[in-house]
């Protein structure tokens, strides 16, 4: 356990020293379990399985039994460190140098979890060991070890497990690194959806000297790529930027220079706003492909399953409360933003309003991932401000 159980830096260092490269836990959830159990939380460790994937350990802890109920969510798994020799400091040592805490997960998101735990423990220590002196209210932690990989045995199943137990949540703070430049500049109130597919064009293989005996899919797939990018998917909304389709690879699997290939494939991803669902986008894209094919090109799309729909937490009392806590500590009025990639908030939104607010994300997933120690202290103060206002 940390030498100071309510100190965010000490908690973060203990977490960073657990090399929990997804799907490994490496003791990270145990660090949290010991801290929360000692503070009076009812702590549950739950393992979920899925054929073809690793078994994943998860943690759910709650103190209090009544509303209002605020949940802090997050993940303790991290991406691989890459070339560890390229790191200035050991990726799993949790070392501080020149006021910066180094380590894989310092930003994404062990640092954020450490701040939320420290803030909650400090809050409880000044409120008689309860969310509110009256005994009303609940605080919980919903922590998974399966976010950075396939995300099938983590938050999505932990929420289902909690709901089956009768757990209900009023609001959730997900401590992902939401800030762009400085702590306090951004609250994520939603995320775009994500849909991936492979455009496949069938041709007829043949010798390049006899093109009339073959059908070359390469110029055909190039024409379809141009056609799909020619017209915007939408113009955006009040809370989302326009949906965007990006091709990420074009492949024919043909090492020869004298053979017309039989097939061409192009992979793409769409980041979409709340004007679409995955199903409506599939219909739209397939219609555009067929229109561009005419009666000559033979094309189809192989869609990947998507569990990442667009969502937004409408600005209101809860976002105002969090923004006020941020401005009170940092002096910054945060932007309410829906940019970036997907997160586990896409699962949480089906159970309660959720916002994302954590550290600054500039070094996440990079060599020498790091965060200023001062930011850990500031984020802890902000979370404490959220709790003070929430249980006022």
Swiss-Prot record:
<dbReference type="InterPro" id="IPR002933">
    <property type="entry name" value="Peptidase_M20"/>
</dbReference>
<dbReference type="Pfam" id="PF07687">
    <property type="entry name" value="M20_dimer"/>
</dbReference>
<keyword id="KW-0028">Amino-acid biosynthesis</keyword>
<dbReference type="GO" id="GO:0006526">
    <property type="term" value="P:L-arginine biosynthetic process"/>
</dbReference>
<keyword id="KW-0378">Hydrolase</keyword>
<dbReference type="Pfam" id="PF01546">
    <property type="entry name" value="Peptidase_M20"/>
</dbReference>
<feature type="binding site">
    <location>
        <position position="365"/>
    </location>
    <ligand>
        <name>Zn(2+) 2</name>
    </ligand>
</feature>
<feature type="binding site">
    <location>
        <position position="148"/>
    </location>
    <ligand>
        <name>Zn(2+) 2</name>
    </ligand>
</feature>
<comment type="similarity">
    <text>Belongs to the peptidase M20A family. DapE subfamily.</text>
</comment>
<keyword id="KW-0457">Lysine biosynthesis</keyword>
<keyword id="KW-0862">Zinc</keyword>
<feature type="active site" description="Proton acceptor">
    <location>
        <position position="147"/>
    </location>
</feature>
<dbReference type="GO" id="GO:0008777">
    <property type="term" value="F:acetylornithine deacetylase activity"/>
</dbReference>
<protein>
    <recommendedName>
        <fullName>Succinyl-diaminopimelate desuccinylase</fullName>
        <ecNumber>3.5.1.18</ecNumber>
    </recommendedName>
</protein>
<keyword id="KW-0479">Metal-binding</keyword>
<dbReference type="InterPro" id="IPR036264">
    <property type="entry name" value="Bact_exopeptidase_dim_dom"/>
</dbReference>
<dbReference type="GO" id="GO:0050897">
    <property type="term" value="F:cobalt ion binding"/>
</dbReference>
<dbReference type="GO" id="GO:0009089">
    <property type="term" value="P:lysine biosynthetic process via diaminopimelate"/>
</dbReference>
<dbReference type="GO" id="GO:0009014">
    <property type="term" value="F:succinyl-diaminopimelate desuccinylase activity"/>
</dbReference>
<feature type="binding site">
    <location>
        <position position="176"/>
    </location>
    <ligand>
        <name>Zn(2+) 1</name>
    </ligand>
</feature>
<comment type="pathway">
    <text>Amino-acid biosynthesis; L-lysine biosynthesis via DAP pathway; LL-2,6-diaminopimelate from (S)-tetrahydrodipicolinate (succinylase route): step 3/3.</text>
</comment>
<feature type="binding site">
    <location>
        <position position="108"/>
    </location>
    <ligand>
        <name>Zn(2+) 1</name>
    </ligand>
</feature>
<keyword id="KW-0170">Cobalt</keyword>
<dbReference type="GO" id="GO:0019877">
    <property type="term" value="P:diaminopimelate biosynthetic process"/>
</dbReference>
<dbReference type="InterPro" id="IPR011650">
    <property type="entry name" value="Peptidase_M20_dimer"/>
</dbReference>
<dbReference type="GO" id="GO:0008270">
    <property type="term" value="F:zinc ion binding"/>
</dbReference>
<dbReference type="InterPro" id="IPR050072">
    <property type="entry name" value="Peptidase_M20A"/>
</dbReference>
<keyword id="KW-0220">Diaminopimelate biosynthesis</keyword>
<feature type="active site">
    <location>
        <position position="77"/>
    </location>
</feature>
<dbReference type="InterPro" id="IPR005941">
    <property type="entry name" value="DapE_proteobac"/>
</dbReference>
<comment type="function">
    <text>Catalyzes the hydrolysis of N-succinyl-L,L-diaminopimelic acid (SDAP), forming succinate and LL-2,6-diaminopimelate (DAP), an intermediate involved in the bacterial biosynthesis of lysine and meso-diaminopimelic acid, an essential component of bacterial cell walls.</text>
</comment>
<comment type="subunit">
    <text>Homodimer.</text>
</comment>
<feature type="binding site">
    <location>
        <position position="108"/>
    </location>
    <ligand>
        <name>Zn(2+) 2</name>
    </ligand>
</feature>
<feature type="binding site">
    <location>
        <position position="75"/>
    </location>
    <ligand>
        <name>Zn(2+) 1</name>
    </ligand>
</feature>
